[in-house]
């Protein structure tokens, strides 16, 4: 198992239609907080420069989502719908992996946002808005069988991703990374979430099981991995 797609998929992939536009007369950008006034000014100057090419309406920019990083995402109305704007301070975030993997996914024929504009030195990006509704929002919890079609579509997308794999394109999902990921289970699930303490014999059993999992994964064909 090789090839880490995490830098891209931190942006939430969606199954929904584009959200409705902000009602006229509302200026939601006033509620967005900026730690640095100079970055706020640079952001609005850059966004205003996208009006001619992409029809954005800068006065409608509003918070969309955030992730476990310094990146922030905003939604902005346009003359044809909405777009997503990424704010990624270049001294804290490297957008190059995001851009590279976005191209990989689009080239594979997967449903992913296109990058419409990118100011690499400043860390601003304009993207397609593919919505905010996730698969978890639409699954039927009362009738699991009704979700079969959704899960098959998800599996088809993963197969398409794997079939597009090319060697030496993404960093390898090596033994060290696999071990680090597996270590999250005892540290975060058992200890933090379940409040369980395991003894030395249980830990030894876990370590042996993890080693078996790692070796079997390393022996399998190497393909792109969607870590989320």
Go through each PLM region and give its residues.
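Aromatic (phenylalanine/tyrosine) cluster motif
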Residues: 8-11
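ATP-binding pocket architecture of kinase catalytic cores
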Residues: 64, 74-175, 184, 191-194, ...
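Short Pro/Gly-enriched beta-strand edge/turn motifs at strand-loop
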Residues: 54-60, 97-98, 208
């Amino acid at each position: 198992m090789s090839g880490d797609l995490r830098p891209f998929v931190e942006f939430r992939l969606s199954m929904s239609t584009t959200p409705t536009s902000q009602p006229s007369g509302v200026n939601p950008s006033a509620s967005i907080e900026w730690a640095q006034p100079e970055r706020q000014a640079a952001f609005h100057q850059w966004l205003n420069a996208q009006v001619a090419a992409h029809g954005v309406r800068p006065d409608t920019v509003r918070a969309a989502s955030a992730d476990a990083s310094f990146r922030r995402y905003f939604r902005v109305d346009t003359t044809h719908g909405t777009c997503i704007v990424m704010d990624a301070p270049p001294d804290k975030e490297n957008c190059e992996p995001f851009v590279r993997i976005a191209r990989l996914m689009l080239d594979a024929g997967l449903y992913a946002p296109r990058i419409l504009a990118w100011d690499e030195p400043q860390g601003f990006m304009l993207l397609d808005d593919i919505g905010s509704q996730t698969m978890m929002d639409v699954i039927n919890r009362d009738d699991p069988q009704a979700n079969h079609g959704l899960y098959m579509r998800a599996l088809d997308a993963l197969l398409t991703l794997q079939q597009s794999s090319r060697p030496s394109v993404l960093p390898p999902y090596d033994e060290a990374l696999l071990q680090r990921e597996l270590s999250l289970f005892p540290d975060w699930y058992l200890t933090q979430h379940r409040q369980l303490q395991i003894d030395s014999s249980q830990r030894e059993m876990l370590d042996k099981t993890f080693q078996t999992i790692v070796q079997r994964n390393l022996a399998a064909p190497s393909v792109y991995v969607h870590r989320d």
